[in-house]
Swiss-Prot record:
Top-level taxon in the UniProt lineage: Bacteria
PANTHER family linked: RECOMBINATION PROTEIN RECR (PTHR30446:SF0)
Gene Ontology molecular function, alphabetical: DNA binding; zinc ion binding
UniProt keywords, alphabetically: DNA damage, DNA recombination, DNA repair, Metal-binding, Zinc, Zinc-finger
Organism of origin: Neisseria meningitidis serogroup B (strain ATCC BAA-335 / MC58)
Protein name as annotated: Recombination protein RecR
ZnF region ranges: C4-type: 60-75
InterPro entries per UniProt: DNA_Rcmb_RecR, Rcmb_RecR, Rcmb_RecR_Znf, TOPRIM_dom, TOPRIM_RecR
Length: 206
């Protein structure tokens, strides 16, 4: 039987694991047992990798994704079309768009979405950083690439209102993406079609 002190350490591991997406108390307990019983060396590597990432990975100064250095590789690429800016929910969405090879412009990563049930309001989607990003004047079209979920639709609505009186053409991905579908799980072909057939929300101009 574990001593009280050791039990506290084990419970601390479980509590730490529960911060991961879709990991509840039972799943966290199973992962903790597995790491301690079978994967101690791998767990040490995980700790080292996490500590290194926390020290070296920051937000890109332009698009707000994660990167090592001031700018991510995409923002630093001068061959990208800076006139089109795709606004996405999270860094994984950028990776999926790049894999689909359907957007040669730049990105802005919101790092969140509106979810009133969880108390996540407009402050969750980095509108202030997005406004700063648009200050350069090169952008002509904003492509809203949020998912067709309740949260994604709410976020898209707030974004469209934000851009309403600004001089940008605004469009959103077509609904070829399944209703309720996150971009992370959409295949490359469907994703590309949704970009090419994107729906116009407003024309550019003041």
């Amino acid at each position: 039987m574990m001593s009280h002190k050791k039990q506290d350490a084990f419970q601390g591991l479980i509590d730490a694991l529960k911060v991961l997406p879709n990991v509840g108390p039972k799943s966290a307990q199973r992962i903790a047992y597995h790491l301690l019983q079978h994967k101690r060396k791998e767990a040490e590597k995980l700790v080292d990798a996490l500590q290194t990432a926390l020290k070296q990975v920051y937000h890109c100064a332009m698009c707000n994704t994660f990167c090592e250095g001031g700018l991510c590789d995409i923002c630093a690429d001068e061959t990208r079309d800076g006139r089109r800016l795709m606004v996405v929910h999270m860094p994984a969405d950028v990776s999926n768009m790049e894999a689909a090879n359907c957007h040669d412009g730049l990105y802005f990563v919101l790092m969140g979405q509106i979810n009133t049930a969880l108390g996540m309001d407009v402050s969750a989607i980095a509108l202030d950083r997005l406004a700063q990003r648009l200050g350069g004047g090169e952008v002509e079209e904003i492509i809203i690439a949020t998912a067709f979920t309740a949260e994604g639709n709410a976020t898209a609505y707030v974004l469209s209102e934000f851009f309403k009186n600004l001089p940008y053409k605004v469009s959103r991905l077509s609904q070829g993406i399944p209703l309720g579908g996150e971009l992370e799980y959409v295949d490359a072909g469907t994703l590309a079609q949704a970009v090419y057939e994107r729906r116009l929300i407003k024309e550019g101009g003041a």
